[in-house]
Design a protein with these regions (language model features):
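Catalytic domains of carbohydrate-active enzymes, especially glycoside hydrolases
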Residues: 1-12, 192-200
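The start of beta-strands in P-loop NTPase/AAA+ ATPase cores
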Residues: 2-4, 17-18, 76, 242
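Short glycine-/acidic-enriched loop or helix-start segments at secondary-structure transitions
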Residues: 17, 30, 90, 168, ...
Length: 258
């Protein structure tokens, strides 16, 4: 397809191997159930991750990180989103409501959402003041080791929240970092600067033009999650976004090239 970047999500399984999957559970994407962290590699590899999408994909398995690297290393840039274990996450009723609104407005109805006007930023203090437990260094070193083995340290960057950014900065300071901390709390740019990030990954519907302008003024590359039509992607590029994540690459890329 020629995508300049691929975004993927990583979770460690019970054996400590790195599984590529969006969700912390296998329930939605396979014929199994349970948390990835509670399942062994062999248990996960026995699950069918393709049948629900199309009969043509029946029998496809959730890949290990190394299996993905064996296919794409040095062929494209990897945006490696290291997910935070659910047990470490802190939320509030207000944040749950914000997430529900995001889902209803922008996932269910695919609304093209321009940046919000200045003044709507509503930072939830409980999220900002929560204790941060650094991401497991042993697991993080496995990620770095895999990148080094496949000689693609120059073709990857790490995306995560405060726990991941803290560990990334300590363990592999030269590996570029992309900030997600505060992406639903209007504080993402400040945290990107706090953690010495090179990129920031905004969430549509929770971004203002002032946030984009501040990020660019500080030399940050601006990602945005997400846009699934050429019109929506173009609208975000026009206001200063550098890289748009999409679930629909081919039609979006074709539309933008016209």
């Amino acid at each position: 397809m020629g995508a300049p970047e691929i975004e993927l999500d990583l979770w460690p399984d019970k054996d400590g191997h790195l599984i590529v999957c969006h969700d912390p559970k296998v329930d939605r994407t396979t014929d199994g159930s349970g948390m990835i962290c509670d399942l062994t590699t062999s248990e996960i590899k026995a699950l069918d991750a393709g049948f629900w999408f199309s009969p043509a994909y029946q029998g496809i398995r959730l890949p290990l990180f190394e299996e993905v690297l064996s296919l794409v290393a040095r062929r494209t840039v990897l945006n490696i989103h290291i997910k935070t274990p659910v047990a470490q996450r802190v939320t509030t009723d207000k944040m749950k409501a914000r997430g529900k609104e995001l889902g209803e407005r922008h996932i269910s109805h695919a609304v093209i959402m321009p940046p919000l006007p200045v003044g709507v930023e509503d930072v939830i203090p409980e999220i900002e003041n929560r204790p941060i437990v650094p991401y497991d260094e042993t697991v993080f070193r496995r990620i770095v080791d895999a990148l080094q083995r496949f000689d693609c340290m120059d073709y990857a960057y790490i995306t995560g929240e405060a726990d991941v950014l803290t560990t990334a900065r300590a363990v592999a300071p030269d590996l570029p970092r992309c900030c997600l901390e505060g992406h639903m709390n209007f504080s993402i740019v400040e945290h990107a600067l706090e953690y010495g990030c090179q990129r920031v990954q905004f969430c549509k519907g929770l971004t203002t033009q002032a946030m984009i302008d501040k990020a660019r003024a500080n030399g940050l590359i601006c990602n945005l999650f997400w846009a699934d039509t050429p019109e929506e992607a173009r609208a975000y590029f026009d206001i200063g976004i550098d890289c748009v994540l999409t679930n629909n690459y081919q039609p979006v890329a074709a539309g933008l090239s016209r």
